[in-house]
From Swiss-Prot:
Belongs to the VPS27 family. It comes from Aspergillus terreus (strain NIH 2624 / FGSC A1156). It is a peripheral membrane protein. GO terms for cellular component: endosome membrane; ESCRT-0 complex. Coiled coil: none annotated. The gene is vps27. Component of the ESCRT-0 complex composed of HSE1 and VPS27. A zinc finger (FYVE-type) spans 165-225. PANTHER family: VACUOLAR PROTEIN SORTING-ASSOCIATED PROTEIN 27. Residues 232-259, 276-310, 323-355 are annotated as: Disordered. This is Vacuolar protein sorting-associated protein 27. One of its GO terms (molecular function) is zinc ion binding.
Amino acid sequence: MAGWFSSASPLDEQVERATSSSLEDIALNLEISDLIRSKSVQPKEAMRSLKRRLENKNPNVQLATLKLTDTCVKNGGTHFLAEIASREFMDNLVSLLKTEGLQLNTEVKEKMLELIQDWAMAAQGRMDLSYVGQTYQRLQEEGFRFPPKTQISGSMLESSAPPEWIDSDVCMRCRTAFSFMNRKHHCRNCGNVFDAQCSSKTLPLPHLGILQPVRVDDGCYAKLTSKAAQSSGLSDRTSFKNNSITKSSAMEPRTARAEGGFDDDLRRALQMSLEEAQNKGSSGYVPQPKVAQEPPKPSGQPTAEEEEDADLKAAIEASLRDMEEHKQKHAAALKNTTSETPSHQPQNTTTLPKNPYELSPVEVENIHLFAALVDRLQHQPPGTILREPQIQELYESIGTLRPKLARSYGETMSKHDTLLDLHSKLSTVVRYYDRMLEERLSSAYSQHSLGYGSIPSGPGYPNVYPSMPPTAEGKAGAENFYYGNSVVENPLTASNPQYPQAAPDMMSREKDTHARRPYEPQYVYTALHSLSTTILQWNGAPATDLHSPPPSANVP
């Protein structure tokens, strides 16, 4: 009798099968999320179906329903996220957490808190999902204990869904007006409106969760079939139309193709890295194992993997070539060293101590490879790292190098400090040496400029000064005549032992002249000659003795 008044929808039946108390059916969960994303069912209806399933008293059913809800949130599209973030659904979760009569199962409660926290962190910055963050903050203030936070990107909630339909009075391709005979048709791929002539093609849209052939316009049909032809190698578009159901795997989204190509290259690189890491323990040079060449593929159009991952392959090949060149150079250097070393003098050969904390080229290459893989995984879906256990093995092998790397870094820093100390000492020594050179040069120059010595003997120098008249007015008159001064009225007599007061003035002038002019031998001899001539004039010598050597008497 109850079946006459209530009938379960197909979605309710699928939700009931997916949330049964048995093991989780991931394939059925993804199928339900595709139905929601393709808008085959209304998002509010799907939300209420999950809400009713959470009212079940069986903890296993509740856990399965929460997992199904999380799968639909991540793959159901924006229109379903808006229903999950509504007050109707979030307040129902809060009421289940605050149940007083019958205590909620511990695992169910922890799973609810974990999902609310993850959804709130992923929905940060989105106004249409703000109620999830408000609910999360309110539960924190009320004292609910959430699990440790995990960094979740907002891209977790991004999934492709069919676009909203756009209305128009004319066809958006041929601009023909719609009428009673010319009806409107919407393209499921772009959401624009067309007439029957411009939208007569049908295609499945797996990237939008639509696996059955649906109506698309001519422009979208050309784009999708051209991509399918490049990925599957088909040249005829009609063959894809007739076999669209059986060959729907060829219409995978671009992200899936890129992920497949990345997995193959990643697996190949990890295998080579692990082989090198296993061989690093043996002593001596270990040649790199030759990679078995794959059989040549039939010539044709390039596959999607080669198109999407050409940069990654080129980087891996360049890295392998560099490693091979380094190993060949190392082997050649070892061979030359062995050939040049005489075999009959083993006691004279000395080998440099090898640093036990120095990283080998293979270890350095593994570190660079792991860094490149981690950087590449940041742009991949979250589940990529879980499908490749080789990454964990590479991480463990690199983790053992951390003490070695730290010790090597410490020794390098100590060497750096030692070299800086030596550099400062060397700079100080060079500065002292330069100062000593400057002091010696200055002292030598001063001694050479002050100590002229005696005038060498030889032919007399020509008299560049005019001869004194025979009736000179004494020594003062000769001095005045020499310097061009006026004649003193009271000249000194021969009996006066006092020297004229102009002599210090003359000496200062001679010193100034020596300081201003450069050091030249002819000028030195001329200056000495003029000085001796003046002294002879003071002593009353005749004018004919001006060119003779100076007297040996001490001049005051």
